[in-house]
Amino acid sequence: MRLRTWIVAVSVFLLPALSAAQSAVEAIDAHKHLGVASCSNSVCHGASQVFKDSHVMQNEFAIWQETDPHAKAYALLDKPASREIARKLGIGDATKAKVCLDCHTDNIAASQRGERFQVSDGVGCESCHGGAEQWLNAHADKKVAHADNLAKGMYPTSDPLRRAQLCLGCHMGTRDRMITHRIMGAGHPRLSFELDTFTWLGRPHYVIDEDWIARKGDWNGVRDWAVGQGVAADNLLDQLTDAKAGWQGIFPELVLFNCYACHKRMSDKSWGPRQGTGLGPGVVRLNDTNLSMYRHVLAAVDKGAAQQLLEQTRALHRATTESRDATIAAAKKLRSMLGESMPRVAAHQFDAASLNIILADIEADAQRGEFRDYDAAEQAAMAAQSVIVAFEASGAIDKTKGEALHGKLDAVYATLKSDTGWSMSSFQSAIKALRAAAP
């Protein structure tokens, strides 16, 4: 087993402990944040072009500032749409409201801000890499190992489990940073997240080369997708079982439920049964998209566990129609099952045979009507993309085959241009054509 796989497997094994001990938010905020300006010197990360003799690009600041949406996140709060959301919520100025600042900038406590720190920088370096107070100077020294920087508070973004926990804090919400249904009701855009896809959105400020691998271990996109699905599913259950964050009065926090279970036109007659829920029409159901995707992961790793996940997911859905106690008990049982399976997922070698199993399992679910909602189909499309890229990286397909598959993948995404005009049958046809063209 390679070192990177062992590290990921160990961190996944410790998933429940990590959730209970130090969250990603707490880890990021553990040390003083010195500000983006402390990283943007032209001989550090603020160069205008890539340094050829450096183990990092050194123009990371320019890439972030010019092309990364994170750099513009704070500025969005002063837009008319943001001001209207804040007005509806009754929280005052969006550029000063904690619930907005927590995700639209680096909202570290005032006592933890260095002299060059600026809230207006948006989601900057230390929002993801952790407070640089102890590692800023050390990480520039080539003689200092990456592990030493991590020990000084640098956040382990190369570890897919910890990266997923970090990203979910804002891209879906966690128990210590809840993004509630009230925020959505006030007009905030729907949230969606998939680790592998979102890691590569936009222009990356790093290159996975031999030097990167030597310092941080192998990179495997499908494994990142798989681990990310497991962490996202665990995060849902973590919130659902938290009496303070996951419940509002007698109801679970509604943001944990599927948007499209309720948000349909009254004239819509598209309801149909889903094997994955076992529920009838007119029932508000949990957003189980990550649980469904993780079942496709397990199809390639442990078929028995995949069946167990299906049964326990159905039991959770059933429990939500019974009582609060039944829901929490079912969620805890399912979360335990996830924790037991994830070390095997992290250690699994996703070869061409595994990729075929995953893609076939997704296509089979599509044909039986499991992706009845837009958000489920969206997750299936991102999963298919990770699989296709992995086929290419493994050498299982040549350039011509890869181009053909990407054409089929484009057709899948074309069915997802709008959630208002989305057609399940069109998606089924597109994903079937993609599967037929795969190796």
Language-model segments: residues:
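Bacterial N-terminal signal peptides
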Residues: 8-17
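Short N-terminal segments immediately surrounding and downstream of signal-peptide cleavage
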Residues: 22-42, 46
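Residues immediately within or flanking Cys/His clusters that coordinate Zn2+
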Residues: 32-41, 93, 97, 122, ...
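Cys/His/Pro-rich metal-binding microdomains
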Residues: 37-45, 101, 126, 168, ...
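Post-signal peptide N-terminal segment of secreted/secretory-pathway proteins
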Residues: 87-126
